[in-house]
UniProtKB/Swiss-Prot annotation:
Swiss-Prot/TrEMBL keywords: Golgi apparatus, Membrane, Protein transport, Transport
Name of protein: Conserved oligomeric Golgi complex subunit 6
One GO term describing the cellular component: Golgi membrane
Pfam families, per database record: COG6_C (PF20653), COG6_N (PF06419)
Length: 630
């Protein structure tokens, strides 16, 4: 029964295995595939015997493989044993070394402690070193800076970095105040003293270099270094003044040499030509000399201004003017000698007056550029001298025109001619005066010049005219003087600043007009038989003889027909129509006034004149109208 039951179970197990095998996906089972692949290497023929021996073969092969593993692991074990021995040896060595280290550590403990202490000290000293280096870098000059400040050699030139180092010296000196505030007075004072010495030495070197540079200036090559140097030297007024003096001395010599070269040699290559080539033309010669100075001296002033461009710590305008004055003073002697030579040699009054105006013009121009000094004094002296010379020449020329023909002493004109016109000498002197006054000038002092010139000519001319007319009859003298005065007045009236002189001449003319009017009126009174009648009027007598009135009225009617007939012949010789008309009008007014008195006396019923209309048939208004309309 049990066997019967076991068979189905056995079959089931077999069936399950078969099913399991059948259901297995051998293509995805790598281990099974590898096993089958290995089996194919020794199970080559599928026979019953081979299948029965398969198990034993597999076990045999398994034993062989295990033996190979065992042999291999034996070699590994031997190697591991050797490694273990080495490790044991190393452990022993390590223990030995550890023991030695412990021993050494115990022995060097103090050394290590000392080393650590020294290491900390070194770190502290390193910090101090860095602080000291920073302090020195801030408050001391480096070797390169020291060399820049004092120069590699005695005559080493100044370079731009010199001023940078000098600024650093001044900055260090200023920063020492911070040190003093922080309590480092001793160090600060020492550094300040050292920087002061550096600064003094640097400024002394800068002074020598600047002085030498100024001595060698030829073409005013003022560069930025010399400008900066002057700015730094301003802190030392004495050195600053010495440099300015040296510059002025050098430039004075250069200016004088260039002036002499311009006079004698001209420009480069002869262009422009030497100024002295025009010495025969005084106006151009003197004008060219002053034009050259007018160009050169302002250039010197511009260069001085450039030299002092950065000198803004104090007012140096006086020093600039003094230096410029000293430079310009060098040309005084050669200029004065040449101008005085021209003034002494020239005789033409107009040329002398032109030169005087040139001198005054350039004197005013130069005063705007350079004030004070010998040049200004020289120009003032030359201008005054030229004024005296041309006024003297003018006076001599006037005297030569007015000289007596007989050569006697004193001045006199030609005797007046019958026509009583001004003599030729008057016209000649007035034309000469006109030529002088026509010289164009816009300088200050023109009014004084014109006044002096006019006085130099007109005063002796007036005196001579009056002397020459002294022997003439009254009427002739009046006409002659009036004509001469009119000629002078009309000549001067066209010029400026002549108002006062013209007024004085007009006053003299008015005096002569009064004289001529009086003479003309007296002549009319005599010709019209007004003398007896006028005497009666003046005596306040009421009765006038009728016969006198008839004679007067007869002549009066003839006079009213032709008023000019009774005019003095000399009045017709008056050159000015206005003067002539004035004499005529004033004298006629006298007659009209007398006629009016007579008319009123005759027509007054109290005087008992019969038929006054027949005696005086014209009213005073009619008489005045007739005489004023002629």
């Amino acid at each position: 029964m049990s066997s019967t039951q076991e068979k189905p179970e056995e079959l089931d197990r077999i069936q399950k295995r078969v099913n399991k095998i059948l259901e297995a996906r051998l293509e995805s089972d790598k281990d099974t595939l590898d096993a089958l692949s290995g089996l194919s290497t020794f199970f080559t023929e599928n026979t019953l015997q081979n299948r029965r021996n398969l198990r034993s073969q597999i076990e045999h092969r398994s034993v062989g493989i295990n033996e190979n593993f065992l042999k291999a692991f034996r070699q590994v074990k031997l190697s591991l044993d050797a490694v273990c021995e080495d490790l044991d040896t190393m452990a022993t060595s390590v223990e030995t070394m550890k023991s030695d280290l412990e021993t050494s550590k115990a022995l060097t403990k103090d050394l290590i402690k000392q080393t650590n202490t020294m290491q900390r000290e070194r770190d502290r000293l390193e910090v101090h070193k860095q602080i000291a280096q920073a302090f020195l870098a801030r408050f001391q000059l480096s070797g390169a800076e020291h060399q820049l400040l004092y120069g590699a050699a005695k005559d080493a030139p100044i370079v731009a970095d010199f001023f940078r180092v000098l600024d650093r010296v001044q900055s260090i000196h200023a920063d020492c105040r911070l040190l003093m505030q922080c309590g480092y007075q001793t160090a600060a004072i020492d550094i300040m003293e050292e920087m002061t010495l550096h600064q003094e030495g640097a400024l002394e070197r800068l002074y020598r270099w600047t002085q030498n540079h100024c001595r060698s200036l030829e073409n005013n090559e003022i560069g930025p270094l010399i400008v900066e140097a002057m700015s730094r030297l301003q802190d030392r007024p004495v050195l600053f003044k010495y440099v300015i003096d040296e510059y002025a001395i050098a430039r004075r010599a250069v200016l004088v040499r260039q002036f002499i070269e311009a006079l004698t040699e001209g420009g480069p290559g002869g262009n422009p030509k030497p100024i002295e080539l025009h010495a025969h033309d005084p106006k151009r010669y003197i004008g060219d000399m002053f034009a050259w100075l007018h160009q050169s001296i302002p250039t010197e002033k511009e260069n001085l201004s450039l030299l002092f461009k950065k000198c803004d710590k104090q007012d140096i305008s006086d020093q600039l003017q003094n230096a410029l004055g000293y430079i310009a003073d060098g040309v005084c002697h050669p200029l004065k000698v040449r101008v005085e030579t021209i003034l002494q040699a020239e005789k033409d009054t107009i040329v002398l007056f032109t030169i005087s105006n040139l001198l005054r013009f350039y004197q005013q121009i130069m005063r705007q550029v350079v004030q004070g000094g010998s040049l200004e004094e020289c120009l003032v002296e030359l201008q005054k001298s030229s004024e005296q010379i041309y006024l003297g020449a003018l006076a001599a020329q006037v005297r030569s025109v007015l000289q007596r023909p007989s050569g006697g002493s004193g001045l006199a004109l030609e005797p007046p001619q019958r026509d009583l016109v001004p003599p030729p000498s008057v016209a000649r002197l007035l034309n000469m005066l006109k030529e002088i006054l026509s010289v164009a000038t816009m300088v200050d002092g023109r009014q004084a010049d014109i006044t002096k010139i006019v006085s130099c000519v007109i005063d002796p001319l007036l005196q001579s005219v009056q002397e020459s007319a002294a022997h003439l009859p009254t009427v002739d003298m009046g006409v002659y003087l009036l004509n001469c005065l009119h000629h002078m007045q009309s000549s001067l009236a066209v010029y400026e600043y002549m108002d006062e002189r013209v007024e004085r001449l007009q006053a003299q003319s008015d005096a002569q007009l009064d004289t001529l009017t009086s003479e003309q009126a007296s002549s009319l009174v005599a010709n019209l038989n007004l003398g007896p009648i006028y005497a009666i009027l003046q005596s306040n007598q009421s009765k006038i003889e009728t016969n006198l009135l008839k004679i007067f009225m007869s002549k009066m009617d003839a006079f009213l027909e032709l008023p000019d007939v009774l005019l003095l012949p000399q009045v017709q010789l008056i050159m000015s129509s206005s003067h002539r008309a004035a004499v005529q009008k004033r004298s006629f007014n006298v007659i009209v006034a007398i006629y009016k008195q007579i008319y009123e006396r005759v027509h007054d019923p109290a005087n008992g004149f019969e038929q006054p209309e027949q005696l005086l048939h014209r009213t005073p208004e009619q008489v005045a109208h007739i005489l004023t309309s002629t």
